[in-house]
Amino acid sequence: MRSEKHLLPLPPLLAICCLGTLHLSSGFPQSVPSYLEGLDIPESEIPSFVMDLCSSIYNRMKVNEENNHEIYKRFLFQFSRAKDPSLKIGESQIATAEYTKRDSSGIVGRPFFLFRPRNGRKVSINEH
């Protein structure tokens, strides 16, 4: 994946390849590659054939890019939403009330937690 940063983007690279296969009448002698000679296409129609081929490839790539963009947006939307908390506030209050320390005289009044309270908070004895 790191090598993609050094390569040209695909549409300009595709355009360069397509233009390289065409006959240019501006004085640059260019030969038609051997793979185009076996297609039984007259030389006058080869440039239009190559351009049609290039445009169909480019249009197919464009559709794939749009689909990838939609999938990426859906992925971001799905995972950027806040999740429902697994333990709701009401349930945690019930769980705290059920687990209280007891001694011989009854309930001391200071709840203990299965897990340590967040942010280093401590429960004072006078609160309950």
Curated annotation (Swiss-Prot):
It comes from Bombina variegata (Yellow-bellied toad). The modification Asparagine amide is found at residue 119. Residues 28-72, 75-100, 123-128 form a propeptide. Neuromedin-S-17: stimulates uterine smooth muscle contraction (B similarity). Synthetic peptide NmS-17 induces calcium mobilization in CHO cells transfected with either human FM-3/GPR66 (EC(50)=0.085 nM) or FM-4/TGR-1 (EC(50)=0.231 nM) NmU/NmS receptors. This is Neuromedin-S. The keyword Secreted applies. One of its GO terms (cellular component) is extracellular region. It is found in: Secreted. Its main location: secreted.
